[in-house]
Amino acid sequence: MIWHTFFQPFIEFGFMRRALVVCLALSLSTTMLGVFLLLRRMSLMGDALSHAILPGVAVGYLLSGMSLLAMTLGGFIAGIVVALVAGWVSRRTPLKEDASFAGFYLGSLALGVTLVSLRGSSVDLLHLLFGSILAVDRDAALFVSGVASLTLLCIALCYRGLVSEAFDSAWLQVNHRRLPALLHGLFLALLVLNLVAGFQVLGTLMAVGVMMLPAVAARCWARTLPGILLLAAGMGALCAWLGLSLSWAISLPAGPAIVLTVSALFFVSLFFGTRSRLLVGWRTLMG
């Protein structure tokens, strides 16, 4: 039973192997970005940007159909533009950056759905919103793997700066005047790039789930930042494997099955995590 559910599909079927490789690559890169979003108290920014890329993806779709290059380029440009404009608005107005993102992403989501509806069918819209992980081809797998490798390399090279900017940006601003802006720009670019890569697999609505939920779950267990990063990546990879296996075994949509698996791990961590222990606190309160 265990062999047939969790191992045999990936040995026998090439599309399952490609889906697993892509999910593992995304788990390594997006979860680490999710941890840094958590440290910055900007957890909803990932959700906002995942919606913000939809108009660019839709424009690429209108111009070139289901072209990987066109939709990727359009989504990346749209995400960067929204991030820059939201940052500019937050500096020029009393609004904070997360509030600016909230305003822009709602309009972006509506615009993207409208653009796709001009040409596509409901099937095309569902593909863009929820992805089609089992239909990932070789080019998409290479693209996602390349994005994950680039992200891990950038995090390794800029780790100290990213940590300093997340915990004490004022100190970094005093000692290195231009560095915080450069690090923030790099972080946003990596965030948008990973969301665009995730859209190829899980769609714009589901991609952020793989980014944020393992990060939050890991925070309930680990005490140190390296521990949170490693645990989040491991949780993301484990849930990707379990989600794909369960989707195969009981005929569930693969993308939602993965996100549901991560959600289940999040709730377990919330109640039983050594840093959370919500259940123990609830029993103490009731007792």
Predicted regions, residues:
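Membrane-interfacial amphipathic/re-entrant helices at transmembrane-helix boundaries
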Residues: 1-28
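Membrane-interface helix termini and inter-helical loops of multi-pass transporters
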Residues: 2-12, 122-136, 245-248
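Loop-to-helix entry region at the N-terminal start of transmembrane alpha-helices
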Residues: 18-21, 125-152
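Hydrophobic alpha-helical transmembrane segments
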Residues: 20-25, 72-77, 102-103, 141-146, ...
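Short loop segments and helix-boundary regions at transmembrane helix junctions
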Residues: 35-50, 54-122, 218-230, 247-250, ...
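Membrane-helix/interface signature in polytopic inner-membrane proteins
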Residues: 153-187
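Transmembrane alpha-helical segments in multi-pass inner-membrane proteins
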Residues: 201, 205-256
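Cytosolic-side transmembrane-helix boundaries in multi-pass membrane proteins
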Residues: 252-287
